[in-house]
């Protein structure tokens, strides 16, 4: 398991070897670990918002002896698994224009600026897959943070216009019904609105 300390130590260790400034946007469980919503994550997931970030990080990983499984997946010398997502795509979700701008600053090193996606976009990227671990993570976000379900649905709907998600309506319906059944948040009115939505 990868804790917040392990995440930050890795970035602190590799930062001196970079020759230019780069942005890393933590996503998924990595972001939730950095935000202290989860204790740990199985691997590290980062978005590289600019082409120069992508080039610099992949070149650095190669120089430092990281094992390249494919263009997206790398393994560090101490066996940490790192997944990289380029530009505005994460999994099958294309982030809307203000997503990177609205990301949260976590740490600034000499070369690396580390941020996390905002909570709404973290939920949206997890809704795209909606595996059991994603459901657990989303419920944890709702329990620990103030999330406006209406704002979430509006942003989700905008994101789905430009994304390639198989069952967008069914996924958010399942989530909102679960949140309602667990008395975590009231979503009945939104569920009726979702029923009328044609993505």
List each language-model region with its residue ranges:
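Compositionally biased terminal segments of proteins
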Residues: 1-199
